[in-house]
Amino acid sequence: MKKNTLFPLLFLTVFVFGMLSFTSNKKVIAVVFNKEMTRQDLMSLQKNLKDKNIILVFNKMKFTKNRLSYIDFSIDFGDGFSGTSKSEISKSKEIGFIRDYNDNAEQPFIVGDLKW
């Protein structure tokens, strides 16, 4: 069981922190919440964003067997882009947010359902 959850968690961690590392170049920040995330993962994400002056607030979270099953959150990038979303977390949904800092971005900010 541990082997099955370690890879998705490792991938998510690398994906999230990899995306966060682009903020110094002002490119793209993308976060997708998934059923493998724990409270500790979410608190770590919140801290990393705060270190970059991005405020992520968890209004409500539910966990099933210590894994994320519901999230109600707000995000504020401090540059006029902010939003909220709440949803059950499932494999068929991609809930989260994307902030694209590129000048020619087709959609500079998305929050909520990322499958479009």
Where are these regions (language model features)?
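Amphipathic, non-transmembrane alpha-helical stretches in extra-cytosolic proteins
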Residues: 24-116
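Bacterial Sec-dependent N-terminal signal peptides
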Residues: 1-26
